[in-house]
Amino acid sequence: MTGCSAPAETSGSRKMVDPFGRNISYLRVSVTDRCDLRCFYCMSEDMTFLPKADLLTLEELDRLCSAFIAKGVRKLRLTGGEPLVRRNVMSLIRSLSRHLQSGALKELTLTTNGSQLVRFANELKDCGVKRINVSLDTLDPARFREITRWGDIQKVMAGIDAAQAAGLAVKINAVALKNLNEDEIPSLMEWAHSRDMALTLIEVMPMGDIGASRADQYLPLSMLRARLEGQYTLTDLDDSTGGPARYVRVSETGGKLGFITPMTHNFCESCNRVRITCTGTLHTCLGHEDASDLRRPLRASPTDELLYETIDRAIGLKPKGHDFIIDRHNRPSVSRHMSVTGG
């Protein structure tokens, strides 16, 4: 009696596990490096953006995302720049939603500055997006303009209103900035919680030349948390979100507050994510200069086998942890900008 042998494992069916046993199930994809704001901790005011010809087409982005989903990605986040300023980006989101319908993908989401949500919130909901992150560092209109260099906070507020009206869950991300918005964190938190939105605080990360010293902007969240504990009752939560944030429940508001602390307490031991830039470069670590070109194998063959092999090699080189430091001599730890990598 002859037994049936198991089918041979192919690169496409092989799940992504790095050298340290971490299963890669979360993909962040920057669909553009362009943004309609110029937040000073992210990019310089006269930022030179990539030539549009260098960007992957929307069809190529779809194929790349689909390849990663075939290899075990269950959460896909679109980022930028500002993802919603990419021309025809909704056609990509609508196409990717087929993976939600098939059950291959558990979550399709995005991080946005909120400026385009009035236009796109309902369509995002129709495409199966259930939750989004909105980057907002202040509630003060003048301070918002200072941080973003020319932004209109009313557009963002209207966008948040539109997102919630469409049925999207919204989480607010705020970068903690020394001597700029640190005094406003309690009121920002109370506002977010009053709107049934979690707030996640993020330390400044040393990525890309921004024409200013990040040492002047850096505020350790351990210090900020200690201040908050003087005003509020914070209870640690054992939320396993697969992300870098550590959450607490704020008794006085009933809401959730997250801390992302790459500088003071890294999150590398549980890292389950990789990033793809809008030019098709794969970065397996936010805080390393590692890079694997996926555009070449993507365009070299109409089938995905070469692409899968390139992905497997890159995952096999994923480092154990990042190299972030705040350099008093104003040198970024990583030369590429967050807007290119995907924030």
Curated annotation (Swiss-Prot):
CC cofactor note: Binds 2 [4Fe-4S] clusters. Binds 1 [4Fe-4S] cluster coordinated with 3 cysteines and an exchangeable S-adenosyl-L-methionine and 1 [4Fe-4S] cluster coordinated with 3 cysteines and the GTP-derived substrate.
Residues holding S-adenosyl-L-methionine: 41, 81, 135, 205
SUPFAM superfamilies, per database record: Radical SAM enzymes
UniProt-annotated binding residues for [4Fe-4S] cluster 2: 268, 271, 285
Subunit-structure text: Monomer and homodimer.
CDD domains recorded: Radical_SAM, Twitch_MoaA
Required cofactor(s): [4Fe-4S] cluster
EC number: 4.1.99.22
Role of this protein: Catalyzes the cyclization of GTP to (8S)-3',8-cyclo-7,8-dihydroguanosine 5'-triphosphate.
Record PANTHER family: MOLYBDENUM COFACTOR BIOSYNTHESIS PROTEIN 1 (PTHR22960:SF0), MOLYBDOPTERIN COFACTOR SYNTHESIS PROTEIN A (PTHR22960)
Swiss-Prot/TrEMBL catalytic activity: GTP + AH2 + S-adenosyl-L-methionine = (8S)-3',8-cyclo-7,8-dihydroguanosine 5'-triphosphate + 5'-deoxyadenosine + L-methionine + A + H(+)
Matching HAMAP family: MoaA_B
UniProt: GTP binding residues: 28, 77, 111, 171, 273-275
Organism: Nitrobacter winogradskyi (strain ATCC 25391 / DSM 10237 / CIP 104748 / NCIMB 11846 / Nb-255)
Domain Radical SAM core as annotated: residue spans: 19-244
Gene3D superfamilies the record matches: Aldolase class I (3.20.20.70)
Pathway entry: Cofactor biosynthesis; molybdopterin biosynthesis
Entry's Gene Ontology BP terms: Mo-molybdopterin cofactor biosynthetic process
UniProtKB keywords: 4Fe-4S, GTP-binding, Iron, Iron-sulfur, Lyase, Metal-binding, Molybdenum cofactor biosynthesis, Nucleotide-binding, S-adenosyl-L-methionine
Annotated family: Belongs to the radical SAM superfamily. MoaA family.
InterPro entries with a match to the protein in the record: Aldolase_TIM (IPR013785), Elp3/MiaA/NifB-like_rSAM (IPR006638), MoaA (IPR013483), MoaA_NifB_PqqE_Fe-S-bd_CS (IPR000385), MoaA_twitch (IPR010505), MoCo_biosynth_MoaA/MoaC (IPR050105), rSAM (IPR007197)
Name of the protein in its database record: GTP 3',8-cyclase
Single GO molecular function: GTP binding
